[in-house]
């Protein structure tokens, strides 16, 4: 009997956690961060990120900073 009550309590807790996670996913923030999906029309990237036309996700504004010599910058 005790284990049945524990299973019911844990089941309700898991159901609550899943429903709250789903609610957070549905009410996402207004802009996307790194590798969030975007299309440039209805979903946008936050400042510091651009929507990649190739992959349709948010990428950094300056992706090649580590490949350039220290004297040159893209931004």
From Swiss-Prot:
Database matches in InterPro entries: Huwentoxin-1, Huwentoxin_CS1
Pfam families hit by this protein: Toxin_12
Propiece span(s): 22-29
Tissue occurrence: Expressed by the venom gland.
Record flagged with keyword Signal: yes
The protein's role, per its UniProt record: Probable ion channel inhibitor.
Official protein name in the record: U9-theraphotoxin-Cg1a
């Amino acid at each position: 009997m005790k284990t049945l009550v524990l299973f019911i309590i844990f089941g309700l807790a898991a159901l609550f956690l899943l429903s709250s996670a789903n609610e957070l996913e549905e009410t996402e923030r207004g802009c996307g961060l790194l590798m969030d999906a975007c299309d440039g029309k209805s979903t946008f990237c936050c400042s510091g990120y651009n929507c990649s036309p190739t992959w349709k996700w948010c990428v950094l504004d300056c992706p090649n900073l580590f490949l350039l010599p220290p004297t040159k910058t893209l931004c």
